[in-house]
Amino acid sequence: MRKKKNVLIRKIIAENRKARFNFELLEHLEAGIVLNGTEVKSLRSNHANIAESYASFENEELWLVNAHIPEYTQANRFNHEPRRLRKLLVSKREIGRFFNAVSREGMTIVPLKLYFNERGCVKLEIALARGKKIHDKRETEKKRDWGREKARLLRRYG
């Protein structure tokens, strides 16, 4: 009998699409996140919002601020606070590199995706980002529109 192949599936829970439009993303990093049991159960039912969240430094540790994971409805009195600070698990070397960029160059750390990896652990993809100005956003929009128009013309006229 043949064995079934293990299919690597990355189940995305929440995605921050605004970050790609509002920021210039420079460096990506995968971080673990410290969660309670009820938070994991809430995430398994695909309830989370990281659109207005960011990461900040406190006591040489990286923390996720303002991420919303709603309360798990079946857990009554042992529930978690939806917008609490959550510790991110990143190596000291990477924390140092990100800390230098944030403190010296005025960058920010933005979460991009919250997902379950192949082993079933919750991971957060974060990026070192620099804010875009209004004219940069318009330029990005023009490039995207021209790319769509070009693809449409190629399909139509071959």
UniProtKB/Swiss-Prot annotation:
Q: Is Cytoplasm there in the keyword field?
A: yes
- Domain of life here? Bacteria
The record's subcellular location field reads: Cytoplasm
Q: What is its main location?
A: cytoplasm
Q: Per the record, GO CC terms? A: cytosol
Pfam families reported for this sequence:
SmpB (PF01668)
Q: What keyword terms does UniProt attach to this protein?
A: Cytoplasm, RNA-binding
- State any GO BP term from the record: trans-translation
Any one GO MF annotation of this record: RNA binding
Tell me which SUPFAM superfamilies the record gives.
Answer: Small protein B (SmpB)
- InterPro entries membership: SmpB, SsrA-bd_prot, SsrA-bd_prot_CS
Protein family per UniProt? Belongs to the SmpB family.
* Protein function: Required for rescue of stalled ribosomes mediated by trans-translation. Binds to transfer-messenger RNA (tmRNA), required for stable association of tmRNA with ribosomes. tmRNA and SmpB together mimic tRNA shape, replacing the anticodon stem-loop with SmpB. tmRNA is encoded by the ssrA gene; the 2 termini fold to resemble tRNA(Ala) and it encodes a 'tag peptide', a short internal open reading frame. During trans-translation Ala-aminoacylated tmRNA acts like a tRNA, entering the A-site of stalled ribosomes, displacing the stalled mRNA.
Protein name per the record: SsrA-binding protein
Species assigned in the record: Bartonella bacilliformis (strain ATCC 35685 / KC583 / Herrer 020/F12,63)
The gene from which this protein is expressed is smpB
